[in-house]
């Protein structure tokens, strides 16, 4: 049995999902528990819900996957700011302190949240970061009945891996 916890957090609409052997077993958005629309916090309640539904603990999981790669997203932001300089300088000066102090090093924050969540969770090698649009595509493809498929993703932001 392969068990995967998917986590989306720290942007908007934080959520958690459990996939076991390629089947979505449970999924929940944090806002359903906190009653905060578009909640961006670490989805502790959603994770508790999906783990309880699947009868698992964090330490039982094979993999934990975060929905994006912060360094790729940071690179895209830098490229965008440079491409439109000097027009975006004010936004750049507002965004960079937050990125340099919090967002860029989300791996450490996630590991701390996971360890606080489950004192038995010790294996941070289970934590992986997926490319943003690959996360979207995987969420459509892997639960589908198809062995091969073309998946189109379209949303407002990502790491810039689209054309």
What are the residue ranges of the model-derived segments?
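Short acidic/glycine-rich loops and adjacent helix/strand connectors
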Residues: 1-163
């Amino acid at each position: 049995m392969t068990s995967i916890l998917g986590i989306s957090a720290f942007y908007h609409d934080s959520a958690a999902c459990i996939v076991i052997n390629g089947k979505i077993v449970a999924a929940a958005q944090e806002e359903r528990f906190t009653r905060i629309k578009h909640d961006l916090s670490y989805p502790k309640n959603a994770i508790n819900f999906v783990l309880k539904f699947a009868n698992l603990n964090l330490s039982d999981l094979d993999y934990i996957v975060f929905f994006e790669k912060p360094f790729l997203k940071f690179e895209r932001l830098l490229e965008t700011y440079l491409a439109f300089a000097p027009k975006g300088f004010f936004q750049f000066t507002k965004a960079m302190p937050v990125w340099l102090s919090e967002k860029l090093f989300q791996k450490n924050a996630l590991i701390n949240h996971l360890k606080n969540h489950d004192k038995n969770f010790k294996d941070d090698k289970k934590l992986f970061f997926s490319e943003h649009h690959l996360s979207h595509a995987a969420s459509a493809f892997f639960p589908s009945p198809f062995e091969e498929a073309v998946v189109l993703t379209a949303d407002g932001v990502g790491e810039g891996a689209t054309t």
